[in-house]
Amino acid sequence: MTYQVFDTTLRDGGQREGISYSVADKLAVARLLDEFGVGFIEGGWPGAMPKDTEFFRRARTELDLRHAVLVAFGATRKAGVDVAEDPQVQALLDAETPVVCVVAKSDIRHVERALRTTGEENLAMVRDTVAHLVANGRRAFVDCEHFFDGFRHDPSYAAAVVTTAIEAGAERVVMCDTNGGMLPSMVTAAVHAVVERAGVPADRLGIHCQNDTSCAVANTIAAVEAGVR
């Protein structure tokens, strides 16, 4: 049985207090991760962070990865904006990475309060962005932000975000415990529900757990035992 590791050190790890990578730092860490045999390296958010834009520019000529695939991270198109006209989506394509990972809201409360749009528009944002990336030759991953909190509040909507991404062509959909408040039993139940009720193959799912309650490793193991690869 094969498992794939998607490393977020250069993006999520840089959000930790006291951490600020230079472009040279990011290139050096990427080389080490590649030596470790990591499958995917999330390099940062081009277009949103100037250092990340520069990292991807330099990576084209300065990184010779033998094992890992470099990934650009960003967001779905904005509400009410044509995906082909969204500058942030274009920045993801301009990074010229084989894989692009976009974050999507999967908690309907955040869709309505943070994005200030409807559930249907959010699904369209996911659908349009994934389809656009795939049409432009990219492998698309989707991070479902606050998935488990959203699933506890409205399981049907959270699952709909996953299925929308898969149907649009996403290679992998990552369920995120963004607040780090889940327990292994909650993770197991949510994974089983998405697989059994929504009909999403478990090997198309990923897991990303924060460690606020020191359960990230246990929750990740629970997801893997439930079939996530």
Regions found by a protein language model. Give the residues of each.
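A glycine-rich helix N-cap at a beta->alpha junction
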Residues: 66-73
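Histidine-centered divalent metal-coordination motifs
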Residues: 208-210
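Alpha/beta enzyme core
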Residues: 3-5, 12-41, 48, 56-65, ...
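Pocket-flanking alpha-helical
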Residues: 53
